[in-house]
C-alpha cells in the first residue's frame, strides 16, 4: 500500500523546482494534491495533468499565500473540492538577494511577507479544519540558510529562521490535538534555477558537501512524504536537514 493513500494535501508554490518535485512524489505515494501557483498557469495546468495521470485527484489554485484573505479562501475552496485536509506543505517563497548595505526596505519586506507571513497565513487558516479532525501534519520548507545564515541573504535567512521558530511553536500549541508540525531544511538543491549557473562554481559547491553532490527535488520530496505519513507519527517540532551533510 502507498504511504499516502486517500491523503489530501495542500501544497503552496508547486509549479516548478522543489515544489514540483514534492507534488509528483506525493501523487506517486497516493496523495490527492491541491497546489497553488502565482505565475505560469500553463505550467500549473501541465503539472495538474501529470498528477491526475498518476490516478489521484489534483487541482491547481491561483492563490497568493502571502495574502491573508487569499489564504483563508484557499482553505475554504480546497475543503469544498477535496473534503478533509490531512497535510499542509508550505513551500512558496522568493529570494531578493543583496548585501545589507544595498538592501532596500522593500526587498526585506517582500521576502519576509512571501516566505514567512505566508506560512502564518495558511497555517492559521488550516488549523481549524485539522482541529476538527484532531489530526494533521504541517510541513514547512525552510533552508540551511535559516540555520547558519548567508552573506547577501539577510532577508532570506531571517525569513527561513523565522519559519523554524514558528514551526516549533505551532508543534507545542497543537500537539495535544495530534497535529504535528515539522520543517524540512534543504541544502544545495539542483533545479532549473541552478542549471544556468557557471559549472565551475557549482562543482565547487558540490566538492564542499560531504556526499559530493547536490541534492535533487526528489531528495526533499522524500523527506516531505515521510513527515506527511504515519511513519513519522511521533515526530513533531523538528527540523530535518536534507543537505548531504553540508552543516555537519
Label every PLM stretch briefly.
Residues 8, 15-17:
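Conserved glycine-rich cofactor-binding loop
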Residues 31-46:
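Conserved glycine-rich Rossmann-like NAD(P)H-binding loop of the short-chain dehydrogenase/reductase
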Amino acid at each position: 500500500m502507498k504511504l499516502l493513500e486517500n491523503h489530501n494535501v495542500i501544497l503552496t508554490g508547486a509549479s516548478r523546482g522543489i515544489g514540483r518535485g514534492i507534488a509528483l512524489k506525493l501523487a506517486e505515494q497516493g496523495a490527492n494534491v491541491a497546489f497553488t501557483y502565482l505565475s505560469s498557469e500553463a505550467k500549473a495546468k501541465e503539472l495538474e495533468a501529470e498528477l491526475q495521470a498518476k490516478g489521484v485527484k489534483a487541482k491547481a489554485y491561483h492563490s497568493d499565500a502571502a495574502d491573508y484573505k487569499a489564504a483563508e479562501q484557499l482553505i475554504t475552496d480546497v475543503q469544498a473540492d477535496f473534503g478533509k485536509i490531512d497535510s499542509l506543505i508550505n513551500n512558496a517563497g522568493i529570494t531578493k538577494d543583496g548585501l545589507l548595505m544595498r538592501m532596500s526596505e522593500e526587498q526585506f519586506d517582500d521576502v519576509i511577507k512571501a516566505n514567512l507571513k505566508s506560512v502564518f497565513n495558511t497555517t492559521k487558516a488550516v488549523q481549524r479544519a485539522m482541529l476538527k479532525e484532531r489530526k494533521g501534519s504541517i510541513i514547512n520548507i525552510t533552508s540551511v540558510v535559516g540555520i547558519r545564515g548567508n552573506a547577501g541573504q539577510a532577508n532570506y535567512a531571517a525569513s527561513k529562521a523565522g519559519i523554524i521558530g514558528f514551526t516549533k511553536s505551532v508543534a507545542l500549541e497543537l500537539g495535544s490535538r495530534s497535529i504535528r508540525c515539522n520543517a524540512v531544511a534543504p541544502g544545495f538543491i539542483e533545479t532549473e534555477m541552478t542549471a544556468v549557473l557557471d559549472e565551475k562554481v557549482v562543482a565547487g559547491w558540490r566538492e564542499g558537501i560531504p556526499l559530493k553532490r547536490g541534492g535533487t527535488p526528489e531528495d526533499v520530496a522524500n523527506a516531505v512524504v515521510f513527515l506527511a505519513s504515519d511513519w513519522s507519527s511521533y515526530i513533531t517540532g523538528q527540523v530535518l536537514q536534507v543537505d548531504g551533510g553540508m552543516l555537519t
